[in-house]
C-alpha cells in the first residue's frame, strides 16, 4: 500500500518541495525518510506544506531569473575546440559533454551533465554545431561549439628523385 508524503526537498521522478505525493513503503522507509527528503502527510503537515510551497515559489523565481540570465549570456559564447584529424578530415575521437563542460568552465560558465538533455551527446564532425541545454525551471538555451582541425595537413606528393648532373666534365 502506497503512503502519502509531504516532500521537504525536490526529488527527481517524484515531485517538488511542498508537494503531497504517494510512494511505495520501501522507497519511503529506505530512502526518503533517512535522507530527510519527506515526512508522512497528516493533518499537522498542512501548515508546513504552505510554508514549503511559498519557499519553493521564491526559489523558483530566483532560479528562473538566473537561468534566463545564463541563457542570454550563452547567446554570444562560442566554445572552440581544435582536434586531430586524418588527411580526409575525419576526427580522431570526438568532443564529448565532459570536454564541453571543461571548456565552458574556462570561460566562467558553470554547466553540469544535467544541463544536457541528451546524456550521450558527442560531436564527431568538424564545423559549427549548436548544443541544446536545459537549465533550471524549464529554461532552454543553445550553446555554440566550433570544432576545427588542430593543424592543416599538407599532402606531400612523393616526387621521384632527380638525377644529379655530373659534377665535372672530363676535359682532354
Swiss-Prot record:
One of its GO terms (biological process) is translation. GO terms for cellular component: ribonucleoprotein complex; ribosome. InterPro entries: Ribosomal_bL9, Ribosomal_bL9/RNase_H1_N, Ribosomal_bL9_bac/chp, Ribosomal_bL9_C, Ribosomal_bL9_C_sf, Ribosomal_bL9_N, Ribosomal_bL9_N_sf. One of its GO terms (molecular function) is structural constituent of ribosome. Coiled coil: none annotated. Keywords: Ribonucleoprotein, Ribosomal protein, RNA-binding, rRNA-binding. The keyword Aminoacyl-tRNA synthetase does not apply. Binds to the 23S rRNA. Belongs to the bacterial ribosomal protein bL9 family. NCBIfam families: L9 (TIGR00158). This is Large ribosomal subunit protein bL9. It comes from Chlamydia caviae (strain ATCC VR-813 / DSM 19441 / 03DC25 / GPIC) (Chlamydophila caviae). The gene is rplI.
